[in-house]
């Protein structure tokens, strides 16, 4: 039997749906860790085998630690055991509680040019609204945006340490703004915002299609609606307006694409990779 983690059956889209894990102990019941195999039928229902004691335990995705989720990710079996749409809560150091969902598996590129096993995106937005920039400009695009700096400093610092310990640096391609899509920047972030392409699978406001591909969690306008303090609200994407030197692309309160001035205040729904 291989060392690692094993979910007996896949988790559904609910944080309350249980999964089963094999815990490994010495015969004196000293906990060793969890065990995993692609062939779950080789495990006993419980009891001693090969000098160890095994116990079947119930868990939910809400009950998994970020270290356990990271182990699933690094083992290469996360896609078999978790599902797009699985939802988990995060309590920030400010005591604000946010919820994230699995947006996809093996979708994003990390800063070392490997593939991220799991991408999470917030279900809704932070309680506070933010400007993309302090003035009416999108020069430099997401790479130069004030909100990018805020997201990866002030906001990032409010995330719990166990999550920050396993959060990877994600590499995104974003246009440079200035009313043109002639220049594409490489941007490496721990926290980031999805692009118009990643949310809609099209780029009617961005004007260029090189900013990633659609996350399967977004299937229609309803799936793109996000709330600020309990009410549907507009929120930022990381896409600069392709024909406007001062605006960024947003999602409106009905889940439709739109655009607004960079110095306006709107919701922020961040993503990250494990």
Indicate where each model-derived feature is located.
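Collagenous Gly-X-Y triple-helix signature in extracellular proteins
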Residues: 44-274
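Short, low-complexity N-terminal tether/leader segments at secretion or assembly junctions of large
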Residues: 1-20, 28, 32-35
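Exposed boundary/loop context
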Residues: 3-6, 26, 44, 246-248
């Amino acid at each position: 039997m291989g060392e690692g983690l094993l979910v007996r059956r896949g988790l559904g889209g609910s944080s309350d749906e249980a999964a089963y894990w094999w815990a490994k102990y010495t015969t004196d019941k000293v906990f060793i860790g969890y065990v995993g195999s692609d062939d779950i039928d080789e495990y006993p229902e419980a009891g001693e085998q090969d000098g160890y004691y095994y116990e079947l335990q119930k868990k939910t995705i809400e009950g998994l630690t970020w270290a356990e989720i990271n182990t699933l990710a690094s083992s290469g079996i996360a896609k078999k055991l978790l599902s797009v749409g699985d939802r988990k809560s995060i309590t920030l150091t400010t005591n604000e509680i946010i919820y994230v969902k699995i947006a996809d598996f093996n979708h994003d590129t990390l800063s070392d040019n490997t593939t991220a096993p799991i991408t999470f995106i917030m279900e809704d937005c932070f309680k506070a609204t933010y400007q993309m920039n302090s003035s009416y400009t999108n020069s430099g695009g997401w790479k130069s945006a004030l909100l990018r700096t805020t997201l990866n400093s002030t906001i990032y610092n409010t995330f719990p340490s166990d999550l920050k310990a396993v959060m990877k640096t994600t590499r995104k391609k974003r246009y440079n703004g200035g009313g043109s899509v002639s220049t594409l920047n490489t941007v490496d972030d721990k926290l980031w915002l999805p692009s118009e392409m990643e949310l809609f699978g099209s780029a009617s406001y961005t004007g260029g299609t090189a900013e990633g591909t659609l996350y399967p969690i977004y299937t229609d306008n309803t799936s793109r609606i996000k709330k600020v303090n309990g009410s549907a609200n507009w929120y930022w994407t990381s896409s600069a307006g392709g024909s406007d030197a001062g605006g960024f692309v947003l999602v409106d309160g009905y889940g439709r694409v739109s655009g607004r001035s960079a110095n306006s205040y709107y919701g922020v729904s961040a993503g990250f990779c494990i």
